[in-house]
Amino acid sequence: MWNIDSSDKYDAWFLTLDEECKEAVLERVLLLREYGPNLSRPYSDILHGSKKLKNLKELRNQTQKHILRVAYYFDSARNAFLLTGRDKKGKDQDRFYKDLIAESEVIVERHEKELENERRNKNDGK
């Protein structure tokens, strides 16, 4: 089993979803917890286009009304980290992914700084 954590941005997005969408997303999150970085299409895919991140991925699922995507990566602590989620239905694909990746890069940068601070504080406490 892989550890999974999430950003405040992801958590806020998830709370806006209807029950059908929440179930669809949780289905993929449970697969991610089980398979970790080995989870592949059609459940997960690599996100290309980031100049900063080589290991950015997306969880993929859809309902009758929504095409759901959750950006995630494996952080420096080797945990799956859910970054943000969006509904792709009716969106321009290039713009959708450009915005998703840009937002993900900002969240990753902040998250990695927090992890580094935690490591420093832990080492200072020894």
Where do the model's predicted regions map?
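Basic, Lys/Arg-enriched alpha-helical interface segments
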Residues: 1-67, 76-80, 87-126
